[in-house]
């Protein structure tokens, strides 16, 4: 008799994805972040659901309802901070996951990569709308500034912004719709993640060498299930350290002031995980140019498979490309720092140089390095 996990219509899917899945024997800890993202998503949906039970999406009561959650609801404070800091962990895992894909050439799986890019955009949209919900100063002004960017679109821009706002400014209608979208999008993300996994399992996982591992596969369970559990425990440990010891470390103090349309905060900035894109936006003096650069800073990932010139898939044996990759990482960290600084010298110039460098690295230097490395192989 066949094992139920191999014959049952539902269990068969789980079995083929998480138990009997043939996996490369040499995938490193950089491959842990996919499962960690799944854990982050489940955690965000669960904590978010409990927060939604007590939250009110009305401009007059939103801020008070968040205070009420933290003060009066049983364990409301920990649920709120798990959700807020869980978003930070989510983005750390996301950026590492994308970085891993870049380094080891996982972008050669085109469908998986492109759905990943759609996922990244969707998660960013969800996080942005979630930041608006507590209705603090930075929530309100962040929503105003970022939605206003759409007014840079010629001809239809202003109409589009007012349509998104549901009025002539960010107000009750905006908050209500943002809450609705923030609630529904994680489920769309979960569905997309399922498709992401479906396409990945069509080809099988990549591995650090970038060479086919078909001749050396091991079952996912127990080898990688135990490895993923260890990763999950470390993730939860870091998250709990953050939540229990320094819950406001990554937040903005301005968001503890209720939203006031008549008082603009001195420095409007998004959450830390958007600062690199915000720095690129600010480093271009033209509004439409800035918006295009902002979108392109993420959308450039879609062009990476087209820009791959090397005969090798992975960067494991390509020292020049490795050097450029880590320069890109350092550059994005520099942009993250600049995004949190006021718009004044020397930060303006640093931001502009770092922005130009980030695009140059991806569009020019890395493809050229690939060609050079191909020639070095012939020597």
Swiss-Prot record:
This entry's Gene Ontology molecular function terms read: metal ion binding; ubiquinol-cytochrome-c reductase activity
Task: Provide the topology term for how it sits in the membrane.
Answer: Multi-pass membrane protein
A GO biological process of this protein is:
mitochondrial electron transport, ubiquinol to cytochrome c
Q: Which residues cross the membrane?
A: 33-53, 77-98, 113-133, 178-198, 226-246, 288-308, 320-340, 347-367
* Location(s) in or outside the cell: Mitochondrion inner membrane
Annotated residues for binding of heme b b562? 83, 182
Entry cofactor note text?
Binds 2 heme b groups non-covalently.
Q: How does it assemble?
A: The cytochrome bc1 complex contains 11 subunits: 3 respiratory subunits (MT-CYB, CYC1 and UQCRFS1), 2 core proteins (UQCRC1 and UQCRC2) and 6 low-molecular weight proteins (UQCRH/QCR6, UQCRB/QCR7, UQCRQ/QCR8, UQCR10/QCR9, UQCR11/QCR10 and a cleavage product of UQCRFS1). This cytochrome bc1 complex then forms a dimer.
Say what the protein does. Component of the ubiquinol-cytochrome c reductase complex (complex III or cytochrome b-c1 complex) that is part of the mitochondrial respiratory chain. The b-c1 complex mediates electron transfer from ubiquinol to cytochrome c. Contributes to the generation of a proton gradient across the mitochondrial membrane that is then used for ATP synthesis.
Q: What name appears for this protein in its UniProt entry?
A: Cytochrome b
The protein's gene is named MT-CYB
